Amino acid sequence: IWGPYDGWAKDGTGDTGFTMAHSMTPSLANPYLFIYKGAELPRKNSIKDKDGNAHPGGLNFKVGPQSAGCYTFGSTADAIRGSYDGCLDIAESDYNQKQTVVGGQSHNRYAFFSVPVGVNYIELDIKELTVFFDKR
């Protein structure tokens, strides 16, 4: 999990924005499914979209603990590298509902999910290209 949601924290395992406390674990039953189950995710910083609107708790998913050139699973929000970030707002009413992710190394690296207060469970399916957020 990467992004400003945790205040761009760093614990020495990779680039700014990565911490082992918020890393995802591959499922033993399905190698395409990654799970985060732990403490409630913080919402320290926001993503600003092309209109200047702030979206707290912005995050996306990267393969590996580096941000530059890393394969990323981002939201479907409009984003252009070097111009503006995009953010898809997730509400509590969206808990346990699948959202589409976009995989690649292009503009999707700057497309985030803004998660609500209380999220402590995430399932990312990199085969089906879906993610869902929950509070458990």
What are these regions (language model features)?
Residues 62-64:
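Extracellular recognition modules
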Residues 1-56, 66-92:
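Aromatic-rich carbohydrate-binding modules that target alpha-glucans
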Residues 57-59, 120:
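Exposed beta-strand face motif in extracellular beta-rich ectodomains
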